[in-house]
Amino acid sequence: MSSPVSRWTLRLSVLIAAIVVLVLFGLSRSIIGQAPVPFRSPPPGSPPAKIRAYGEFAGCPEEPALFHRCAQEKAKTFVPPRTPDGKPDFQGFWNRIGIRNLENIEEHPESLDGSGGRSSIVDPADGRIPYQRWAAAKRDAHFEKYLDAGQYCLPDGAPRFLWGATKFVVQTPGYVFMLNDYADTYRIIPTDGRPHIGPKIRLWQGDLRGRWEGNTLVVDATNQLAETTLDHIGNFISPDAKVVERLTMIDKDVIYITTTIEDAKVFTRPWTVAFGWRRNPNPKYESWEQGCWEGVQSSLKYTDEGRKRSHGAFEK
């Protein structure tokens, strides 16, 4: 029979071993958490990510910051086609130029197509979202889960509506209509000068009001219904965000777009994203109804692929 001393020695040894295992496990999780994550923004001060080369559209580089500068110059001289009422004619099917920032609107070393992407943020100049400290911590928690409203087939709010894939645009006097190929969402944008609705009414797209400033369509979005994610990885804005979108044609087949977001609850200052649309060249293209609802397998497969490649992400 073992003595009381030997039994206590054994228990102490087991306890010490358990503590060592827990410490090592916690350390490994910490190390993993600090490792480069495919879709996560590199820490401030990191060297530029190694990514696949960008293309070119309408004589402008596809890379967001370069496209932004080039498009600003082209917008000064390009004369767009006109609708019968004299407004720039944006009608037709449009695709986003590049999909590299669907995962993360900031710079990231990898995307689902393997190319990676430079930041689509052109102001501030460092390409970083100017989060308040608490909001940055919440964003980091989203990163660990690859949190995206798309897995629930929730409608894209402003500003993400314009950042997605195919759009169909129709114009009439006093209105611009936009149909999204994702989740059958759409926009009805009055351009007749009417005021915004009351602040107590909240909408998925926000309350939209458009106006023409020369050749540029300016859309103000207020009254967001809920907190909205901006990309697959979980950057976000609050329902009180104010969004200003500016769409300018720089070529008969290219529209240059900027989105400025102001949200005093989440950010330390307003910030701006730049990107573009290119005209769909297929004259027979049709936008089909998308089967999209919470739990639909096609959406789960897409977001699960992102989770598999993100540290800390949960599995289905």
Protein language model features and the residues they cover:
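N-terminal secretory signal peptides that target proteins for export/translocation
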Residues: 1-11
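PEST-like low-complexity, intrinsically disordered acidic/proline/serine-rich tracts
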Residues: 9, 13-14, 24-316
